[in-house]
């Protein structure tokens, strides 16, 4: 079958593909906020209808949370399952957006044209690259490129509470030869296949001291201040060399193989440029590790939020009853998230004084994943990406967490390949999220080339 005709069709119909993406981006499918539940269902229905128009047998499947979209189509060749997620992050702080987050537009920037909207890169723009490649292939050849399953989640940004039960319940339906995940990015301007993902452990802690807020003049110096207790706990989590002090935290962590270390060094990662783009200059983390190691292959502990007492306008001399913090850990192969949760909580308990209490609330746990690149499909996809982007594709790590990659292995007994077209400056999870028009266009073309290589 002619690949050139498909690529030409993609080029010719890019404006229509952008229109469809914009229609999806206008739906505020924020999964963490119950106020947007109907919008999440609307996004799922929109995608199911679009897939049906391409010849998929597709539907939005109900779950206790937000719907899953599942579509089956095509025949012959290697059975590929594509995964993406249609839910998006909240838009706070809204006042930092240059325009309404769900009013997508194309902007001209010094670095090229970009699509500006919440979800543009994470993950609506990415998932639509796959769907648009299917559309162009069908337009040219009258059929989908092979046997395909599309599996789109609506709770990825809120911990995926329905994902494992759904996958276990529909194990046989979802089973394929290989999973394709489009939720990662390029390395600089170079195409990449992600082969290592860190796991994630989320914890919220609340320290309670007095049974109500107190006047700091009447009680200050005599009553325990939970903010001070919490600050001490947070300060205790790292030593002066940047290592995490939770007992047993590094159990099972191994050093990076020399071959992988050499490959990463060959990428010529410029940490000064990487940090400079966000107004920083000095690498943090363990002092004896390179920035790429810290980003991709070392575990971390970060404070994501801390609050308590009075934070409104003006000043209030309050001694608060409670203090709160949200803390996340990025994990690497060999670490057990459930054991680490226990170790962290035990560490915190040892630091809570007699007159205070601590409560914990968990926010998900997933182990790290390492992909098996011995499958010939990886080299075939790598070559296809290189042809499209005009430069070799690299195998890279990813500091983020995509639990579905591990679930494909543990639940469905199949490998996953992670290919994406995002960039470091896409501002995912932040105001003014964007997705390069080039990433969208060449992403569609990349999938068409991968179809030709794998199906």
Please identify what each model-predicted range represents:
Residues 193-208, 417-422:
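Flexible glycine/proline-rich, aromatic-decorated loop/lid segments
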Residues 2-94, 322, 339:
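N-terminal helical capping/dimerization or prosegment-like subdomains
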Residues 77-149, 442:
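Active-site metal-coordination/substrate-binding segment of hydrolases
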Residues 86-88, 151-160, 182-187, 209-211, ...:
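Acidic, glycine-rich active-site loops and adjacent beta-strand->loop/helix elements
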Residues 165, 220-241:
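A short core secondary-structure module
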